[in-house]
Amino acid sequence: MSMLAIDLETKNMSFDIGGFGNTHMFQVSTVATWDGTTGTVYVDEPLDSFAKSGHIVKSLGQLKYDLDEHFEKGGLLLGHNIKAFDLPILRDSMDIYCINKYVKAEQFVDTSKILFKEHGERFPLKNLVKCTMNDFKLMDSADAPKLWKMGQYDEVVEYCMKDTQLVYDLWKYGQDNGFVKAFSIEKGEHK
């Protein structure tokens, strides 16, 4: 089983387009994937420092072909809240219709959905990686569209890549240890 963590960032916010139900109106700025060894970033803007990071840089247009190839090889997609956010946006905003195949075949793992089903509570990725691995996100997701508009593409791409690595490491930790840790805001205790 080949697991590929995926994350995307947008140029706009949900309130700019009338809410999360309008996934076709999101403008994707960058998508990152991480398989535990190799990172690939899909972006159409020029990158300065990130291009020298050792990760692969491809155009956003190449993403649909790479995802379709991954699906055909039996690969799974991994992400935090990907069923409600990333997958619909990729399908509806970027016309990446192979996403329908992933959903229909259930070839994806959504860490947010799994934890909600088990605990009845949503845990932000920031909470999970801090409590489980003592790691951190590079920024809040709401900052990414603002930085993108300011032309700070490298920072947004680096943030997106780091999130894929964090989700992958969190998933791997859960696989290896049988649990992940979080702080329950509702109950005021660690889980």
Where are each of the predicted segments found?
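Conserved RNase H-like, two-metal-ion catalytic cores of nucleic-acid enzymes
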Residues: M1-E69
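Acidic, Mg2+-coordinating catalytic module of metal-dependent nucleases/exonucleases
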Residues: L128, T132-H190
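Conserved DEDDh/DEDDy metal-dependent 3′-5′ exonuclease domain
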Residues: T40-R122
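Acidic active-site catalytic centers that drive phospho-/nucleotidyl reactions
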Residues: D7-E9, D110, D163
